[in-house]
Amino acid sequence: MTKEQIIEAIKEMSVLELNELVKACEEEFGVSAAAPVAVVGGAAAGAAAEEKSEFDVVLTNAGANKIKVIKAVRELTGLGLKEAKEIVDGAPKTLKEAVAKEEAEDMKAKLAEVGAEVELK
């Protein structure tokens, strides 16, 4: 199997399948997919503490129009219908973790448009 074939296979996976793949790779090779934490000194550490650069996007309430919220969740996460419905029905649920501020704000705005309540943590 070539690298290109592997990449194509990964592109076709859902978020849940990708999560399972990462966990299986971690177990198989005894590694962690977590990003290494760099120690920052002095003023740079204070600046980093002031403004967060990554956020978790949490669906706190689907609101009255669940169908539109499910469609928005599918569009934003790439999940299948069943997985998106489970997240919406089980709110509060984390949609995405460690998302850049701009993307997190965009996701929040799109979900708010369809009546969902979203929190950035």
Curated annotation (Swiss-Prot):
It comes from the Bacteria. InterPro entries: Ribosomal_bL12 (IPR000206), Ribosomal_bL12_C (IPR013823), Ribosomal_bL12_C/ClpS-like (IPR014719), Ribosomal_bL12_oligo (IPR008932), Ribosomal_bL12_oligo_N_sf (IPR036235). One of its GO terms (biological process) is translation. CDD domains: Ribosomal_L7_L12. GO terms for molecular function: mRNA binding; structural constituent of ribosome. One of its GO terms (cellular component) is cytosolic large ribosomal subunit. Keywords: Ribonucleoprotein, Ribosomal protein. Pfam families: Ribosomal_L12, Ribosomal_L12_N. The keyword Ribosomal protein applies. Belongs to the bacterial ribosomal protein bL12 family. Homodimer. Part of the ribosomal stalk of the 50S ribosomal subunit. Forms a multimeric L10(L12)X complex, where L10 forms an elongated spine to which 2 to 4 L12 dimers bind in a sequential fashion. Binds GTP-bound translation factors. Forms part of the ribosomal stalk which helps the ribosome interact with GTP-bound translation factors. Is thus essential for accurate translation. NCBIfam families: L12 (TIGR00855). This is Large ribosomal subunit protein bL12. The gene is rplL.
